[in-house]
UniProtKB/Swiss-Prot annotation:
Protein name: UPF0612 protein C569.01c
Transmembrane segments: none
UniProt-listed InterPro entries: Mug135-like_C
Chain segments annotated as coiled-coil in the UniProt record: 27-63, 131-225
Gene3D superfamilies per record: 3.90.20.10
UniProt record similarity statement: Belongs to the UPF0612 family.
Record flagged with keyword Transmembrane helix: no
Lineage: Eukaryota, Fungi, Dikarya, Ascomycota, Taphrinomycotina
Keywords: Coiled coil
Species for this entry: Schizosaccharomyces pombe (strain 972 / ATCC 24843)
Pfam families per UniProt: Mug135_C (PF08593)
Length: 323
């Protein structure tokens, strides 16, 4: 048997030859080892989270300081620019003055000469464009004259179309009047049919009420008939019991036979004594016999009386407890 203090497998798998006690000790130590490892992992996570929060705060502080410096510098630049504009002492670089004195004059001369040539070119192009536009305007004017003639013809056709439209509208109005009259006639016929159907529905409702009443009466008759059959069979079993014959099956109040419910037949008082409590309760419920769930032997006596086993031998029979 191995010692309870040491395990050579380093908590990987229990050795196959250990006893049950060794195995229980191994399991407890393994659980403690797992809990210790999980606690160490949680501690590492907490330290990493604290370090992350510290770095994030340092970054935010650095960004705020940089933004404050930039805002200060921008504000200083704007103040200096406003001060220079108000004093009028803006100093241009020296190279701008030298460049303006030496090269700017020649550049302006070349620009002015080029602008003159461009103006001449534009004037010639404008004259050519004006001539072309005049010729196009004349063509358009001629086309407009021909279009005016066509428009006059179209006006005449439009007048004819309006007259034809008026005639069509008159015919449509007549058709609408005739259609409206026909629809009213059809609607009156449908209303008459609806009234007839309503009358038929009322008759059907009356017939359904009568049928429901007949069903209730039939159910009452069936209940009375089943109870009458049950009492007749019960009295018959009383006579048969006195004469030493086997009892006949007594049907339930709903007309079903006990055999149809999977219950064993009752032909003598010994058959009742062999029933289980569940079977005895099922018999009593079928016959409508009131009982207490705590009863035992009294349940069998109630069932004996319910099936008509009233002979002296049956009433003196000593029932046993349920198995």
């Amino acid at each position: 048997m191995m010692s309870n203090e040491n395990f050579d497998n380093d908590y990987n798998l229990p050795p196959p030859n250990d006893s049950a006690e060794d195995l229980k000790i191994f399991i407890k130590r393994y659980e403690r080892s797992v809990d210790s490892t999980l606690l160490e992992i949680d501690e590492n996570k907490r330290e990493a989270l604290e370090k992350y929060i510290e770095e994030r705060d340092r970054k935010m502080k650095y960004e705020i300081e940089c933004n404050e410096r930039l805002q200060g510098w921008k504000k200083l630049a704007i103040e200096r620019e406003i001060s220079e504009e108000q004093s009028g002492e803006v100093q241009f670089p020296r190279w701008i003055d030298e460049w303006a004195n030496t090269k700017l004059g020649g550049i302006f001369e070349r620009i002015f000469s080029k602008m003159d040539s461009m103006q001449n070119d534009m004037n010639s192009r404008f004259d050519a464009m004006q001539n072309e536009m005049n010729s196009r305007f004349d063509a358009v004017q001629n086309e407009m004259t021909s279009m005016k003639g066509e428009m006059a013809e179209m006006k005449v056709e439009m007048v004819e179309m309006k007259r034809e439209t008026i005639r069509l509208n008159t015919r449509i109005d007549l058709l609408e009047q005739k259609t409206e009259a026909r629809f009213q006639s059809i609607e009156q016929r449908f209303n008459s049919i609806d009234q007839r159907f309503n009358s038929i529905d009322r008759r059907f409702d009356s017939m359904e009420q009568r049928l429901d009443s007949m069903d209730q009466k039939m159910e009452t008759i069936d209940a009375r008939s089943c109870r009458s059959i049950m009492l007749t069979r019960k009295l018959e079993n009383t006579t048969r019991s006195d004469q030493g014959y086997l009892a006949s099956p007594v049907p339930f109040l709903n007309g079903n036979e006990p055999a149809n419910s999977g219950l064993p037949p009752i032909e003598r008082v010994e058959d009742i004594d062999e029933l289980s409590k569940e079977q005895c309760v099922q018999y009593l419920k079928g016959y409508g016999i009131m009982f207490s769930p705590a009863e035992t032997i009294k349940l069998k006596k109630r069932l004996r009386d319910a099936v008509g086993l009233w002979s002296k031998a049956s009433t003196e029979y000593e029932f046993h407890q349920f198995h």
